From Swiss-Prot:
This is Elongation factor 1-alpha. One of its GO terms (cellular component) is cytoplasm. Residues 194-196 are annotated as: G5. The modification N6,N6,N6-trimethyllysine is found at K79, K187, K306, K396. The keyword Lipoprotein does not apply. Belongs to the TRAFAC class translation factor GTPase superfamily. Classic translation factor GTPase family. EF-Tu/EF-1A subfamily. PROSITE patterns: G_TR_1, G_TR_2.
Length: 447
């Protein structure tokens, strides 16, 4: 075992039939932690079902099914290694809640890999007004995903095959769109690939000898190393709370910022419940401290399971503890709402792990979403494609933070009619001081 590689998270985005599953499956298959025996059994099963063409996507389908069926979240299956990084694929797209997951995502992606269908008609469908290519790229940028890699996929099926002119045409059009969204297209590699045949995924392909840039694997290796927010105060949104016989109450979640360690006195927002952390575990091993990105369970003393809920946030009681938000102001982009959104609108907000109805109390301004310039003060409504600053009031106690200070707790999806109608980033929060919150004996001793 050499030195542990740096971990990065990747989100794979793009239109429905662009080949996301095949490309992701291929990487995991060739570079990943899937046991060869497992793959052979998949291959056999795929062949029996005449799904040979689907081999790589099939890998992902099997993994998805296993992930949905079992409670064991074997994240190792979603990993692959480059020379420099250990990469985790955060969410396998194609999921109905993909956009919601991307926002509340258990994690901030370090890089978005945008898969484009280069075939005749395929590219046009993806980039059209209704296609998801634009929406996903805009989302990635709004949510602070710094790096973007574009894969011009299905190069084996262009007319003629492996067509340079088709590649050039796509690069030109996608670059101009990415520029509108906010990315610098000169910093975005465009890699012509075939996720199915394997061209330029890992090794250079002689079919594409006109292309001199990096392969997909090399492009991933060239991502700048991300900075991790371990210096910030602790924020750990709870995903679940378990009662474990002989141990007690164990909240589970992902450290978003800061560190958590045994002996620390934590305060849970929004209620202000304060207690001592007895132990911290990851993958059944005790930790001396857990860092941002770690999915952990931690044991707390004298706290009933009913006192903690999904969406609560653990924080260090001595370092900017988490508090309930009385109201907050956010920059919101309306993505797919059939009508007009005006003051009083009360959809559900998905922010980190919480899922709470929030009232749009006051639409303060309408802005140009690219430049941020104000277009109109106190507009009557916002509609599709509009962006604006909105003051919001939660209908139940919830914890949110500014995007600038705690990014994962400062971005949200607005859900209505079973879809994501808008996304937002929080600019300012007015907090409530907790009243009458329970402080356990263990925590008092520590004071």
């Amino acid at each position: 075992m050499g030195k542990e590689k740096i971990h990065i998270s990747i989100v794979v985005i793009g239109h429905v039939d662009s080949g996301k599953s095949t490309t992701t499956g291929h990487l995991i298959y060739k570079l990943g932690g899937i046991d060869k025996r497992v793959i052979e059994s998949f291959e056999k099963e795929a062949a029996e079902m005449n799904k040979r063409s689907f081999k790589y996507a099939w890998v992902l389908d099997k993994l998805k099914a296993e992930r949905e069926r079992g409670i064991t979240i074997d994240i190792a299956l979603w990993k692959f290694e480059t020379t420099k990084y250990s990469c985790t694929v955060i969410d396998a797209p194609g999921h109905r809640d993909f956009i919601k997951n991307m926002i509340t995502g258990t994690s901030q992606a370090d890089c978005a890999v945008l898969i484009i269908d280069s075939t005749t008609g395929g590219f046009e469908a993806g980039i059209s007004k209704d296609g998801q290519t634009r929406e996903h790229a805009l989302l990635a940028f709004t949510l602070g995903v710094k790096h973007m890699i574009c894969c011009c996929n299905k190069m084996d099926a262009t007319t003629p095959k492996y067509s340079k002119s088709r590649y050039d045409e796509i690069v030109k059009e996608v670059s101009s769109y990415l520029k509108k969204v906010g990315y610098n297209p000169d910093k975005v590699p465009f890699v012509p690939i075939s996720g199915f045949e394997g061209d330029n995924m890992i090794e250079r392909s002689s079919n594409l000898d006109w292309y001199k840039g990096p392969t997909l694997l090399e492009a991933l290796d060239q991502i700048n190393e991300p900075k991790r927010p371990s210096e910030k105060p602790l924020r750990l949104p709870l995903q679940d709370v378990y009662k474990i016989g002989g141990i007690g109450t164990v909240p589970v979640g992902r450290v978003e910022t800061g560190v958590i360690k045994p002996g620390m006195v934590v305060t849970f927002g929004p209620t202000g419940l304060t207690t001592e952390v007895k132990s911290v575990e990851m993958h059944h091993e005790s930790l001396l401290e857990a860092l941002p990105g770690d999915n952990v369970g931690f044991n707390v003393k004298n706290v009933a399971v009913k006192d903690l809920k999904r969406g609560y946030v653990a924080s260090n009681s001595k370092d900017d503890p988490a508090k309930e938000a009385a109201n907050f102001t956010a920059q919101v982009i309306i993505m797919n709402h059939p009508g007009q959104i005006s003051n009083g609108y009360a959809p559900v907000l998905d922010c980190h792990t919480s899922h709470i109805a929030v009232k749009f109390a006051e639409i303060q301004t309408k802005i140009d979403r690219r430049s941020g310039k104000e277009l109109e003060a106190a507009p009557k409504f916002l509609k599709n494609g509009d962006a604006g600053f909105v003051k919001m009031i939660p209908t139940k106690p919830m914890v949110v933070e500014t995007f600038a200070q705690y990014p994962p707790l400062g971005r949200f999806a607005v859900r209505d009619m079973r879809q994501t109608v808008a996304v937002g980033v929080i600019k300012s929060v007015e907090k409530k001081e907790p009243t009458g919150a329970k402080v356990t004996k263990a925590a008092i001793k520590k004071k």
